[in-house]
Amino acid sequence: MEFENLNKVQKMYAFSDQEMSNYLEIDRATLYRWKEAGEIPESYDSKVNALIAFKEGVRDSGFSLEGKVDYVKVTFKTQDYIDVIAKVLCLQNKPFLEEEKGGSGYDTKYTFQNINLFISKKREDMGCMIELKGQACRQYEWYFENEQKSSWRDFFIRCFEYERTISQGEGKFMNIPRLDIALDEKYNEDGNFELGKLVDLWNRGLVESRLTMKQIEDNGQYGKAKTIYFGSRQSAYHFCFYQKDIEQAKKLGLDIDLIHSSLKFKNRYEVRMCDDVALDFVRKSLNERIDMARLAVWVINSKIKVFERMNGDKVLNREWYSLLGEVDRIGFSTSPVETGFFDKQYRWLNENVSGVTALIKKWENITGDNKLKKILFDGEISDKNWKKLE
């Protein structure tokens, strides 16, 4: 048998040479000899064929994953935030408004919709930081598609290009302090992967990883909502797996069956990276033209191996790799959302004021009072809010 057949399977499941050798019960020197010869001895055909058959078997599963950028922070060693808005974000014609409070150690924030940019007026060495978190990513994607005709790939290319324009001497003039890639497992009427099984497999010694595993359970109306962490949240990378359907049902106040039928959410698998790990991830994606969803799956598979027992043998877990094994079924997507300038204010009014206003109006119809109208029309607009209207 040609070694290339084994090589394809090894790459697909992100096995290191040592892990592949252990799985085949050979030493690494033997694996290297096979690689150099380009062939595998006939006596190992059955084991390798079982791996290849496993690969083909998971290809046709009903599981599917959809990946997206869900959180990104990019810093530059410059305080010229206007230049960063124009040349990196390409949002130079948008009204970024200054806010007195900053965040992440910065004292000043400029914000447009949910898109944030920070600087420190007291510490020039901090430069500036772009922050796109959750909804901000979806809003920015709207400008990708409707105004810029660009993509996340283009955005990160602009980041590296901008670093070159501001570089002065040695050192790093750009960093990615945070990058989260979210992999959403869509709801499947025929069944989905149950996160509790991963905990059970871990307890039975059938999950191999150098990372620590921690499970958090939250009791609620939908039962125990599970969140599983691999690795420390203080480290350069960690994984967070959780039940997205339950999270959204709580957040939106909707029935979980509606979340399944309309939004198609089930589980989410997040790869969270910081600093050099995030930089290397983006560089690999750009240089090798690998979409970030597939690369995120490769990262998970390189750090976590999941097995099961079959006829006494320890073999790859078919259900897990049906979800995270066949990368050809994994797509990178955008979910652009157009947001009006005062949408946050309208949402706040709807959630916090509309009910009370309706109650007061009913009361005033009974009593004949007219205080509500006076309150609504006598309100003053602050200087900060006048700027939003300019």
PLM regions with names:
Residues 1-13, 313:
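A short, Lys/Arg-rich alpha-helix, primarily the initiator
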Residues 25-40:
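Recognition helix of helix-turn-helix/homeodomain-like DNA-binding domains
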Residues 4-6, 23-26, 50-52:
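Secretory-pathway ectodomains
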Residues 6, 17, 339, 346:
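Helix-turn-helix DNA-binding elements, focusing on the entry/boundary residues of the two helices
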Residues 16, 27-30, 338:
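Short coil turns linking two alpha-helices in DNA-binding domains
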Residues 55-340, 348-390:
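Structured, helix-rich domain cores that form ligand/interaction pockets
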